Design a protein with these regions (language model features):
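Conserved acyl-donor/pantetheine-binding loop and adjacent beta-alpha core of acyl/acetyltransferases
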Residues: 107-154, 221-223
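Short beta-strand-centered segments at strand-helix junctions
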Residues: 337-362
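Extended, composition-driven regions rather than compact fold-specific motifs
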Residues: 99, 110, 144, 187-334, ...
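Internal, well-ordered domain-core segments that constitute the primary functional module
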Residues: 146-163, 172
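Short amphipathic alpha-helix that is part of the acyltransferase structural core
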Residues: 27-77, 82-118
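Short, charged beta-turn/beta-strand-edge "cap" motif at the junction between a beta-strand
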Residues: 369-371
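Conserved acetyl-CoA-binding loop-helix of GNAT-fold acetyltransferases
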Residues: 164-179
Length: 371
Protein backbone atom coordinates (compact mmCIF):
# COMPACT_ATOMS: atom_id res chain seq x y z
CA UNK A 1 0.00 0.00 0.00
CA UNK A 2 1.14 3.59 -0.38
CA UNK A 3 3.17 4.70 2.55
CA UNK A 4 1.83 8.10 3.56
CA UNK A 5 -1.74 7.32 4.48
CA UNK A 6 -1.53 3.64 5.34
CA UNK A 7 -4.50 2.44 7.38
CA UNK A 8 -4.12 0.18 10.33
CA UNK A 9 -6.07 -3.07 10.09
CA UNK A 10 -4.78 -5.04 7.11
CA UNK A 11 -2.21 -2.34 6.53
CA UNK A 12 1.54 -2.03 6.78
CA UNK A 13 1.10 -2.13 10.53
CA UNK A 14 -0.64 -5.49 10.80
CA UNK A 15 1.10 -8.77 11.63
CA UNK A 16 0.50 -11.92 9.58
CA UNK A 17 2.02 -14.79 7.59
CA UNK A 18 2.02 -16.05 4.01
CA UNK A 19 2.53 -19.42 2.38
CA UNK A 20 4.98 -20.66 -0.23
CA UNK A 21 7.37 -23.55 -0.75
CA UNK A 22 11.11 -23.43 -0.14
CA UNK A 23 13.91 -25.93 0.20
CA UNK A 24 15.70 -26.35 3.50
CA UNK A 25 18.54 -23.84 3.93
CA UNK A 26 22.14 -24.97 3.60
CA UNK A 27 24.22 -25.36 6.74
CA UNK A 28 25.87 -22.09 7.76
CA UNK A 29 27.27 -20.62 10.99
CA UNK A 30 24.54 -17.98 10.56
CA UNK A 31 21.64 -19.53 8.61
CA UNK A 32 19.76 -16.24 8.24
CA UNK A 33 20.73 -12.60 7.84
CA UNK A 34 18.47 -9.64 8.60
CA UNK A 35 19.02 -6.44 6.65
CA UNK A 36 17.36 -3.38 5.22
CA UNK A 37 15.34 -3.99 2.06
CA UNK A 38 16.75 -2.89 -1.29
CA UNK A 39 15.24 -2.39 -4.71
CA UNK A 40 16.64 -5.74 -5.84
CA UNK A 41 14.28 -7.36 -3.30
CA UNK A 42 11.17 -5.82 -4.85
CA UNK A 43 10.08 -8.81 -6.96
CA UNK A 44 10.43 -11.28 -4.09
CA UNK A 45 8.67 -9.00 -1.60
CA UNK A 46 5.92 -8.44 -4.16
CA UNK A 47 5.45 -12.21 -4.39
CA UNK A 48 5.06 -12.43 -0.61
CA UNK A 49 2.60 -9.54 -0.57
CA UNK A 50 0.46 -11.10 -3.30
CA UNK A 51 0.47 -14.50 -1.63
CA UNK A 52 -0.81 -12.81 1.51
CA UNK A 53 -3.67 -11.30 -0.49
CA UNK A 54 -4.01 -8.22 1.70
CA UNK A 55 -2.38 -4.81 1.85
CA UNK A 56 0.04 -5.69 4.62
CA UNK A 57 2.55 -4.77 1.94
CA UNK A 58 1.77 -3.13 -1.42
CA UNK A 59 0.67 -5.56 -4.10
CA UNK A 60 1.31 -2.98 -6.81
CA UNK A 61 4.93 -2.94 -7.98
CA UNK A 62 5.17 0.84 -8.30
CA UNK A 63 3.79 1.32 -4.78
CA UNK A 64 6.21 -1.24 -3.38
CA UNK A 65 9.16 0.38 -5.14
CA UNK A 66 8.10 3.73 -3.69
CA UNK A 67 7.97 2.14 -0.24
CA UNK A 68 11.46 0.67 -0.60
CA UNK A 69 12.85 3.99 -1.83
CA UNK A 70 11.33 5.76 1.15
CA UNK A 71 12.75 3.09 3.44
CA UNK A 72 16.21 3.59 1.95
CA UNK A 73 15.99 7.34 2.51
CA UNK A 74 14.90 6.64 6.08
CA UNK A 75 17.90 4.41 6.78
CA UNK A 76 20.23 7.02 5.27
CA UNK A 77 18.64 9.84 7.29
CA UNK A 78 17.67 11.70 4.10
CA UNK A 79 14.17 12.81 5.13
CA UNK A 80 12.73 16.27 5.70
CA UNK A 81 11.59 15.21 9.18
CA UNK A 82 12.21 12.08 11.22
CA UNK A 83 8.44 11.56 11.48
CA UNK A 84 8.42 10.55 7.80
CA UNK A 85 10.58 7.53 8.53
CA UNK A 86 9.49 4.11 7.36
CA UNK A 87 11.96 1.24 7.73
CA UNK A 88 11.48 -1.99 5.80
CA UNK A 89 13.57 -5.04 6.75
CA UNK A 90 13.95 -8.45 5.16
CA UNK A 91 15.29 -11.74 6.45
CA UNK A 92 17.17 -13.86 3.94
CA UNK A 93 18.67 -17.34 4.02
CA UNK A 94 22.41 -16.70 4.10
CA UNK A 95 23.47 -19.23 1.46
CA UNK A 96 20.61 -19.21 -1.07
CA UNK A 97 19.67 -15.55 -0.46
CA UNK A 98 15.98 -16.51 -0.42
CA UNK A 99 13.85 -13.97 1.43
CA UNK A 100 11.83 -15.66 4.16
CA UNK A 101 10.10 -12.69 5.75
CA UNK A 102 9.72 -8.96 6.24
CA UNK A 103 9.20 -6.50 9.07
CA UNK A 104 8.68 -2.76 9.32
CA UNK A 105 8.85 0.26 11.60
CA UNK A 106 6.68 3.32 10.94
CA UNK A 107 8.39 6.19 12.77
CA UNK A 108 5.16 8.06 13.50
CA UNK A 109 1.63 6.76 13.00
CA UNK A 110 -0.69 9.75 13.26
CA UNK A 111 0.12 13.20 11.88
CA UNK A 112 -1.94 16.26 10.87
CA UNK A 113 -1.65 15.12 7.25
CA UNK A 114 -2.52 11.50 8.02
CA UNK A 115 -4.35 11.09 11.37
CA UNK A 116 -4.47 7.84 13.27
CA UNK A 117 -8.10 6.77 13.75
CA UNK A 118 -9.08 4.13 16.26
CA UNK A 119 -12.02 3.05 18.42
CA UNK A 120 -11.53 3.37 22.16
CA UNK A 121 -13.19 0.67 24.26
CA UNK A 122 -14.77 1.74 27.55
CA UNK A 123 -17.40 0.49 30.00
CA UNK A 124 -20.67 2.12 31.05
CA UNK A 125 -22.25 0.79 34.24
CA UNK A 126 -25.98 1.29 34.87
CA UNK A 127 -28.26 0.16 37.70
CA UNK A 128 -32.05 0.00 37.89
CA UNK A 129 -33.61 0.14 41.36
CA UNK A 130 -36.91 -1.01 39.92
CA UNK A 131 -35.42 -4.06 38.24
CA UNK A 132 -32.70 -4.49 40.86
CA UNK A 133 -30.36 -5.18 37.99
CA UNK A 134 -26.87 -3.95 37.13
CA UNK A 135 -25.69 -3.71 33.52
CA UNK A 136 -22.15 -3.17 32.30
CA UNK A 137 -21.98 -2.16 28.66
CA UNK A 138 -18.88 -1.98 26.48
CA UNK A 139 -18.99 0.93 24.08
CA UNK A 140 -16.73 2.18 21.29
CA UNK A 141 -15.86 5.81 20.60
CA UNK A 142 -14.04 7.03 17.49
CA UNK A 143 -10.79 8.80 18.34
CA UNK A 144 -8.34 10.75 16.21
CA UNK A 145 -4.64 11.34 16.88
CA UNK A 146 -2.41 13.74 14.95
CA UNK A 147 0.56 13.21 17.26
CA UNK A 148 0.80 9.46 17.21
CA UNK A 149 3.32 6.87 18.38
CA UNK A 150 5.80 4.76 16.49
CA UNK A 151 4.23 1.63 15.02
CA UNK A 152 5.82 -1.75 14.39
CA UNK A 153 4.23 -3.97 11.79
CA UNK A 154 4.64 -5.47 8.34
CA UNK A 155 5.67 -8.78 9.90
CA UNK A 156 5.30 -11.46 7.25
CA UNK A 157 6.81 -14.92 7.67
CA UNK A 158 6.65 -17.59 5.02
CA UNK A 159 5.21 -20.63 6.87
CA UNK A 160 7.60 -22.90 4.98
CA UNK A 161 10.35 -21.40 7.13
CA UNK A 162 8.47 -21.21 10.42
CA UNK A 163 9.52 -24.58 11.82
CA UNK A 164 13.26 -23.98 11.52
CA UNK A 165 15.17 -23.85 14.82
CA UNK A 166 16.35 -20.32 13.99
CA UNK A 167 12.88 -18.93 14.88
CA UNK A 168 12.90 -16.36 12.13
CA UNK A 169 9.55 -14.85 13.07
CA UNK A 170 10.98 -14.04 16.47
CA UNK A 171 14.10 -12.58 14.85
CA UNK A 172 12.02 -10.29 12.65
CA UNK A 173 9.83 -9.20 15.55
CA UNK A 174 12.75 -8.42 17.88
CA UNK A 175 14.77 -6.77 15.11
CA UNK A 176 12.46 -3.77 15.11
CA UNK A 177 13.10 -3.08 18.80
CA UNK A 178 16.84 -3.58 18.36
CA UNK A 179 16.84 -0.92 15.66
CA UNK A 180 14.73 1.44 17.76
CA UNK A 181 17.16 0.99 20.67
CA UNK A 182 20.13 1.71 18.41
CA UNK A 183 18.57 4.89 16.97
CA UNK A 184 16.16 6.24 19.62
CA UNK A 185 16.16 9.78 18.21
CA UNK A 186 14.36 8.53 15.09
CA UNK A 187 11.29 7.32 16.95
CA UNK A 188 8.55 8.35 19.37
CA UNK A 189 8.45 7.63 23.10
CA UNK A 190 5.60 5.12 22.68
CA UNK A 191 5.21 2.19 20.33
CA UNK A 192 2.10 0.35 19.14
CA UNK A 193 1.38 -2.74 17.08
CA UNK A 194 -1.94 -3.61 15.50
CA UNK A 195 -2.83 -7.26 15.27
CA UNK A 196 -4.85 -8.93 12.55
CA UNK A 197 -8.30 -9.92 13.90
CA UNK A 198 -10.38 -12.95 12.93
CA UNK A 199 -11.66 -12.60 9.35
CA UNK A 200 -13.98 -14.73 7.24
CA UNK A 201 -12.68 -17.28 4.73
CA UNK A 202 -13.01 -14.54 2.12
CA UNK A 203 -10.93 -12.22 4.33
CA UNK A 204 -13.91 -10.02 5.06
CA UNK A 205 -14.70 -8.46 8.44
CA UNK A 206 -17.97 -9.22 10.22
CA UNK A 207 -17.45 -6.07 12.27
CA UNK A 208 -17.22 -3.96 9.13
CA UNK A 209 -20.44 -5.44 7.77
CA UNK A 210 -22.32 -4.32 10.92
CA UNK A 211 -20.57 -1.00 11.44
CA UNK A 212 -18.47 0.62 8.74
CA UNK A 213 -20.43 -0.60 5.74
CA UNK A 214 -23.69 0.79 7.15
CA UNK A 215 -22.27 4.30 7.51
CA UNK A 216 -20.15 4.42 4.34
CA UNK A 217 -21.91 2.15 1.85
CA UNK A 218 -18.53 0.64 0.97
CA UNK A 219 -17.51 -2.99 1.16
CA UNK A 220 -14.51 -3.90 3.28
CA UNK A 221 -11.91 -4.13 0.51
CA UNK A 222 -13.03 -0.92 -1.17
CA UNK A 223 -12.93 1.02 2.09
CA UNK A 224 -9.55 -0.45 2.98
CA UNK A 225 -8.11 0.57 -0.37
CA UNK A 226 -9.62 4.06 -0.24
CA UNK A 227 -8.21 4.69 3.22
CA UNK A 228 -4.67 4.22 1.93
CA UNK A 229 -5.18 7.30 -0.23
CA UNK A 230 -7.62 9.47 1.73
CA UNK A 231 -9.06 9.18 5.25
CA UNK A 232 -11.54 12.04 4.99
CA UNK A 233 -14.52 9.68 4.85
CA UNK A 234 -13.59 8.23 8.25
CA UNK A 235 -13.75 11.67 9.84
CA UNK A 236 -16.98 12.71 8.16
CA UNK A 237 -19.05 9.51 7.94
CA UNK A 238 -18.16 7.42 10.98
CA UNK A 239 -20.34 8.05 14.06
CA UNK A 240 -18.85 10.52 16.51
CA UNK A 241 -21.10 9.28 19.33
CA UNK A 242 -20.38 6.09 21.32
CA UNK A 243 -21.53 2.79 19.84
CA UNK A 244 -22.75 0.23 22.38
CA UNK A 245 -21.51 -3.20 21.39
CA UNK A 246 -24.60 -4.90 22.83
CA UNK A 247 -26.45 -3.52 19.80
CA UNK A 248 -24.29 -5.66 17.52
CA UNK A 249 -24.77 -9.39 16.80
CA UNK A 250 -23.24 -11.64 19.45
CA UNK A 251 -20.78 -13.20 17.00
CA UNK A 252 -19.51 -9.72 16.12
CA UNK A 253 -19.23 -8.66 19.76
CA UNK A 254 -17.01 -11.69 20.44
CA UNK A 255 -14.53 -10.62 17.75
CA UNK A 256 -13.94 -7.05 18.94
CA UNK A 257 -10.37 -6.73 20.16
CA UNK A 258 -9.61 -10.38 19.44
CA UNK A 259 -6.57 -11.72 17.62
CA UNK A 260 -6.79 -13.88 14.50
CA UNK A 261 -5.14 -17.30 14.35
CA UNK A 262 -2.30 -16.06 12.11
CA UNK A 263 -1.35 -13.39 14.66
CA UNK A 264 -1.38 -15.46 17.85
CA UNK A 265 2.37 -16.06 17.74
CA UNK A 266 3.13 -12.40 17.12
CA UNK A 267 0.99 -11.38 20.11
CA UNK A 268 2.79 -13.85 22.36
CA UNK A 269 6.16 -12.36 21.41
CA UNK A 270 4.97 -8.80 22.00
CA UNK A 271 3.43 -9.64 25.36
CA UNK A 272 6.64 -11.39 26.37
CA UNK A 273 8.61 -8.17 25.98
CA UNK A 274 6.07 -5.91 27.67
CA UNK A 275 3.43 -4.72 25.19
CA UNK A 276 -0.17 -4.84 26.42
CA UNK A 277 -3.64 -4.51 24.93
CA UNK A 278 -4.50 -0.79 24.94
CA UNK A 279 -8.28 -1.26 24.63
CA UNK A 280 -8.02 0.46 21.27
CA UNK A 281 -9.26 -1.31 18.13
CA UNK A 282 -9.18 -0.60 14.44
CA UNK A 283 -12.33 1.16 13.16
CA UNK A 284 -12.52 -1.11 10.11
CA UNK A 285 -12.12 -4.63 11.49
CA UNK A 286 -11.86 -4.15 15.29
CA UNK A 287 -8.35 -5.62 15.38
CA UNK A 288 -6.62 -4.87 18.71
CA UNK A 289 -3.76 -2.46 19.35
CA UNK A 290 -0.96 -3.44 21.69
CA UNK A 291 1.51 -0.89 22.99
CA UNK A 292 3.99 0.34 25.58
CA UNK A 293 6.45 3.09 26.30
CA UNK A 294 9.58 2.28 24.30
CA UNK A 295 11.82 2.57 27.35
CA UNK A 296 9.70 -0.03 29.14
CA UNK A 297 10.04 -2.68 26.43
CA UNK A 298 12.22 -5.46 27.86
CA UNK A 299 14.48 -5.62 24.81
CA UNK A 300 15.14 -1.89 24.92
CA UNK A 301 15.82 -2.01 28.66
CA UNK A 302 18.50 -4.64 28.11
CA UNK A 303 20.05 -3.08 25.00
CA UNK A 304 23.84 -2.85 25.06
CA UNK A 305 26.65 -1.76 22.76
CA UNK A 306 29.70 -4.00 22.42
CA UNK A 307 33.10 -4.06 20.74
CA UNK A 308 33.73 -7.32 18.88
CA UNK A 309 36.67 -9.47 19.94
CA UNK A 310 37.63 -12.91 18.64
CA UNK A 311 37.19 -15.51 21.35
CA UNK A 312 40.52 -17.30 21.74
CA UNK A 313 39.75 -18.74 25.17
CA UNK A 314 38.73 -22.19 23.98
CA UNK A 315 35.65 -22.07 26.21
CA UNK A 316 32.77 -24.47 25.67
CA UNK A 317 30.53 -23.64 22.71
CA UNK A 318 27.45 -23.63 24.93
CA UNK A 319 28.91 -20.85 27.08
CA UNK A 320 27.63 -17.37 26.40
CA UNK A 321 24.25 -15.92 25.51
CA UNK A 322 21.81 -15.87 22.62
CA UNK A 323 21.77 -12.33 21.25
CA UNK A 324 20.38 -10.38 18.33
CA UNK A 325 23.08 -8.00 17.13
CA UNK A 326 22.90 -5.13 14.66
CA UNK A 327 25.52 -3.10 12.85
CA UNK A 328 26.08 -0.72 9.97
CA UNK A 329 27.91 -2.49 7.16
CA UNK A 330 29.17 -1.40 3.77
CA UNK A 331 25.71 -2.09 2.30
CA UNK A 332 23.65 -0.62 5.12
CA UNK A 333 22.06 -1.93 8.29
CA UNK A 334 22.36 -5.64 9.02
CA UNK A 335 21.54 -7.90 11.96
CA UNK A 336 21.86 -11.53 12.98
CA UNK A 337 20.97 -13.87 15.81
CA UNK A 338 24.18 -15.23 17.35
CA UNK A 339 25.56 -17.07 20.37
CA UNK A 340 28.45 -15.19 22.00
CA UNK A 341 29.96 -14.22 25.34
CA UNK A 342 29.44 -10.63 26.53
CA UNK A 343 31.80 -9.28 29.17
CA UNK A 344 31.48 -5.61 30.17
CA UNK A 345 31.65 -3.67 26.87
CA UNK A 346 33.23 -6.53 24.91
CA UNK A 347 31.52 -9.30 22.96
CA UNK A 348 33.66 -12.40 22.50
CA UNK A 349 32.74 -14.24 19.29
CA UNK A 350 34.17 -17.25 17.43
CA UNK A 351 36.32 -16.25 14.47
CA UNK A 352 34.16 -18.35 12.13
CA UNK A 353 31.12 -16.33 13.19
CA UNK A 354 32.73 -12.97 12.43
CA UNK A 355 33.94 -14.29 9.08
CA UNK A 356 30.46 -15.51 8.14
CA UNK A 357 29.00 -12.08 8.92
CA UNK A 358 31.84 -10.15 7.28
CA UNK A 359 32.56 -8.46 10.60
CA UNK A 360 35.97 -7.41 11.86
CA UNK A 361 37.46 -7.46 15.31
CA UNK A 362 37.06 -4.08 16.98
CA UNK A 363 33.78 -3.17 15.26
CA UNK A 364 30.91 -1.90 17.39
CA UNK A 365 27.52 -3.62 17.41
CA UNK A 366 24.25 -3.09 19.24
CA UNK A 367 22.71 -6.10 20.95
CA UNK A 368 19.53 -7.23 22.68
CA UNK A 369 18.90 -10.59 24.36
CA UNK A 370 17.20 -13.18 22.20
CA UNK A 371 14.86 -14.07 25.06
Amino acid sequence: MPLTNGRQSSSLGAESVVASEVSKPAVSPIPFLLREATLTDAITILRLARLLDSINLPTDKSDLVALIRRSQRSFRGKLKTRQEGMYLFVLEEAVTRKIAGTAMIIAKHGTPESPHYYLEMATDQRYSKTLKTMFRHTYLTLRRSIDGPTEVGGLIVDPAFRQYPAKIGKQLSFLRFLYMAMYPDRFEDEVIAEMMPPLTDNKESLFWECYGKRVTGLDFRAADKLSTKDKEFIETLFPSIPIYTCMLPVEVQKQIGQVGASSQGAVHLLEKIGLRFLRHVDPFDAGPYYGAKVEEVALVKHFRRYRLVIDRSGRETDAGQNLLIGWEGSKGFCAAQIHAQPEASVLFCPAVLLKALHLKEGMEVGAVPFL
